[in-house]
């Protein structure tokens, strides 16, 4: 199911002892006001090279490694137990682990698990056959259809689900097809090389593989250039085009929607739908009508191989890693057990989550964090009420939305329980299992949600995920268990550090409810305008300052951040820091703190914030983030975010002569 959520790529370190470690992290040869990133964590950056298994390092990667071990420990309880009842949680975990770890059988089979489907594609003789097979295999998870049909939330009534129609086929963002920059061109070249090699690995000659790859890419390119670009796709109104089932059949008659619906076993009583992006979908119609049957077969074969390459032999996984190495700069493939842990966590996330919570997350942690969230919520309300540019009526609606936010902490109050429909059979290979899983879960979703009220209190992230998010359609903020326990959050530590780290993250998620996307949704999660026209104009003026400022930040020579694409996340950081600092000040009035190791409480707040984002990164991965992520690179979440915050200037006595100084009237004060 499609969920619109805004997540912050988080990084946490133990708060215990953080203040004592600040001095060791510093590069005191640099003034705080000249380069705060280098000042605050320069020595840490120097002493912490990147692990070869990762494209970056930092607190987030450290926690990912620790979490990997925790989840692996849960899995190991079932790894050797082959006599558990079929369908039980332990049986599913153990069986999937053994299938993933059985390199002998997987290498012996090679690409045999997908061979029946490749034969089906290769035997196609006519366009009609191609359309039929395209729909049938797409329903089995092979992504052979450059179009899609599935459940999504109704943007205007988010307590209900509806059917949405979307294009497929283009695996990269629109910019990679339209006007790719140097780094994007390199990624395209790496992907085309991967595609060709995959086609050779399933028995095609070098010449045939080259022809088939070029045919596939021609289709992908035609669709890709018609997509919304990354800035446009952030506007929810640009992806809403309601129609009826009957009108869909007339407007997009180049696609056999009835056959596709039936292949998916989707409900037959579809009335209203949303066509997310009509233009690329019309291009799909043209592609299906104008492309030769042989080229359509090439497209389908490549998509079929790519969709299940992770479940074939080592050769496919190794080649996929070489692609990842080229585009991210990672140097070593993760060992098989880590890849197995990730796969189990992806496919049995709720099952693992229940075990994770029981083992690692006490109820007391949930209550402590809840109190902290309410503290931040009050600080946000204080700032809203102090706001001088909003009218009282819009301000009142903003406060109402803030306090209507549903708060998920640690784990959901009610589990979705969709994984009970997953059946893992050890007498079948991984491909057969995952084909069945996709079909079973899709059918279960239709049974549970079609024409029935939707529970917006569901948590869109599993408890074991080290992250957090805001969901506009739910108006909910979500903090999984993995980030809310020692060493991620330490309620006994210096609260100046806690507010600077986890506090800014809580504030970040709350601020997403009022960023340039989130502000378009009302307190109930519906896409309804609640702003006065003059208020919205003033808001846009303020956020424009932030967008223009971040667009000046150069990540690599000639490669700058796109301030419009990253605006939502930058508003989140701007608001998150402001709100967390206000909450910190409120606490400071009640419980005064002294200096520690020469740092004031305010300085510790900002040093903790910088330490959260401290990371080394490969040039390739840095380029990938700038080109395809809505988050700004970590360095700019410090050096570009903090110059907009008045209290940072006060904490470190930043002067007009300092390099990072921005005049007060030029700073972006949003929330």
Region annotations inferred by a language model:
Residues 78-371, 375:
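Noncatalytic, helix-rich "gating/capping" subdomain that lines the substrate-entry/channel surface
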Residues 25-46, 180-200, 567, 574-579:
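Hydrophobic/aromatic-rich, well-ordered segments within soluble, folded domains that form packed cores
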Residues 31-34, 39-105:
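Active-site-surrounding "flap" and adjacent substrate/cofactor-binding loops of secreted or lumenal enzymes
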Residues 53-75, 207-226, 498-504, 602-606:
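Short secondary-structure subsegments characteristic of cysteine-rich extracellular domains
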Residues 54, 83-92, 205-215, 231-237, ...:
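Short, glycine/acidic-rich hinge or "gate" loops at secondary-structure transitions
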Residues 1-20:
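Bacterial Sec-dependent N-terminal signal peptides
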Residues 64, 251-254, 274, 278, ...:
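Intrinsically disordered, low-complexity linker/terminal regions across diverse proteins
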Residues 20-61, 173, 476, 481-483, ...:
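His/Glu-rich zincin catalytic helix
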